[in-house]
Amino acid sequence: MELSVLGQNNGGQHSAGGCSSSSCGSTHDQLSHLPENIRAKVQNHPCYSEEAHHYFARMHVAVAPACNIQCHYCNRKYDCANESRPGVVSEVLTPEQAVKKVKAVAAAIPQMSVLGIAGPGDPLANPKRTLDTFRMLSEQAPDMKLCVSTNGLALPECVEELAKHNIDHVTITINCVDPEIGAKIYPDLLEQQAHPRRQGRKILIEQQQKGLEMLVARGILVKVNSVMIPGVNDEHLKEVSKIVKAKGAFLHNVMPLIAEPEHGTFYGVMGQRSPEPEELQDLQDACAGDMNMMRHCRQCRADAVGMLGEDRGDEFTLDKIESMEIDYEAAMVKRAAIHAAIKEELDEKAAKKERLAGLSVASVQNGTSGRYRPVLMAVATSGGGLINQHFGHATEFLVYEASPSGVRFIGHRRVDQYCVGNDTCGEKESALAGSIRALKGCEAVLCSKIGFEPWSDLETAGIQPNGEHAMEPIEEAVMAVYREMIESGRLENDGALLQAKA
């Protein structure tokens, strides 16, 4: 790597906003190790806490159409309703329209906790529109968490203004710390056209690192997003993870490249492949030794509304919100009560989880650590951290790994909905086949209900359906199924068996 300065860690000094050890985490039990002020920032942010995303909603407002970089994986669209990816919106809003929309959504979806600006261009390439929106929201919706996502090119010049408007979560997309690798990702840096291209990419990297340091110094939590591009930066992202951790980033989100040809991106048109789920997990696991990882990202649209994994944007188009009467003072009272109830539920769940964790893991280990191999299981859930969705109604499955050490969240797999009504349920063979392909590597799928045909096809594919744990907490259900697998003798490691026989 040429820019050795990027690897410096300021003597190992981090502000309270940074994650300086691998014990920093995004799941509920890991949050308990954080300082109280940091935990308060994270516990109801669905992007910064894996636990929170089961309970809290978010929305993005599309006030930033322009961008200062052209990335090979991006093709912005401003009037698109049928694609689910970053850089895509149905309508671009003025700051005033955005504020009204936020208040309308917050009143209708009281569990919404976060408002973000993430495009469809770069928010900081549209500083007036972005900062005007934040200024009005901090005045008119003071109970809302505010966050912004940026490529970082204009970040250092905006840090003071962001801090002034109470933005305490910032995401920076950092795909490399080496200009040679950047040359394969960024063909043009539009604000740096006076510079040679290689010099422009070097400036981008320097600006990203400088902005990260400035944010951390001000106690602003930073999440780093990185797009995993096989054959381009996949191995290099391990170095990126080490560097951003050393500089105090709180969370690293390694996302898979989206490269469908119909999206019109350079990579999509040129046939650059996306990573397989197993490749993504391997890279995330490799980075996890140096950095706390986000694994529940849905790569949302720039106008997403609702819980992660759902989009209710059609309910809040400009023509619909124009006629809405919004009493935001009353909405804040209702929102505060609902948020308090969710926090109480999460606290009770965390206490119960702590009591049960030692027992459940001990009952699996029982002095046989290493004897039983880990297992991937898919889960159908509609939220609340429960097994509460019919297999045929799922548009995604959450994937968990169970092992003698416990249960950990791995990621999610998107699928086409198999069952869309009584007349078509069971007739969508292609959707079922796609679901089975998406669940490759999983040995069980937990759901509230499942029909005979998908049950049979899943078993044939070596995936065991399980509907016995409906409405149970996900991690408890996954561990229960894992114990059942152990008791059936399915999970003995070959090496452990040979050693036992010897």
Swiss-Prot record:
Q: How is the cofactor bound?
A: Binds 3 [4Fe-4S] clusters per monomer. One cluster is coordinated with 3 cysteines and an exchangeable S-adenosyl-L-methionine. The two others probably act as substrate.
Molecular functions per Gene Ontology: 4 iron, 4 sulfur cluster binding; lyase activity; metal ion binding
Pathways per UniProt: Cofactor biosynthesis; Fe-Mo cofactor biosynthesis
Q: Where is the Radical SAM core domain?
A: 53-301
- Listed binding positions for [4Fe-4S] cluster 1 are C67, C71, C74
Region described as Disordered: spans on this chain: 1-21
Q: Does the keyword Magnesium apply?
A: no
* Record: residues binding S-adenosyl-L-methionine: Y73, G121, T173
Q: Name one GO biological process term.
A: molybdopterin cofactor biosynthetic process
Which UniProt keyword terms apply here? 4Fe-4S, Iron, Iron-sulfur, Lyase, Metal-binding, Nitrogen fixation, S-adenosyl-L-methionine
Q: Which Pfam families match?
A: Nitro_FeMo-Co (PF02579), Radical_SAM (PF04055)
Low complexity composition bias: which ranges?
A: 11-21
| Positions of disulphide bridges | none
Cofactors that this protein relies on: [4Fe-4S] cluster
Residues annotated as binding [4Fe-4S] cluster 2: C297, C300
Family per UniProt? Belongs to the radical SAM superfamily. NifB family.
What is this protein's function? Involved in the biosynthesis of the iron-molybdenum cofactor (FeMo-co or M-cluster) found in the dinitrogenase enzyme of the nitrogenase complex in nitrogen-fixing microorganisms. NifB catalyzes the crucial step of radical SAM-dependent carbide insertion that occurs concomitant with the insertion of a 9th sulfur and the rearrangement/coupling of two [4Fe-4S] clusters into a [8Fe-9S-C] cluster, the precursor to the M-cluster.
Record's protein name: FeMo cofactor biosynthesis protein NifB
Q: Which organism is it from?
A: Azotobacter vinelandii
Q: What is the lineage of its organism?
A: Bacteria, Pseudomonadati, Pseudomonadota, Gammaproteobacteria, Pseudomonadales
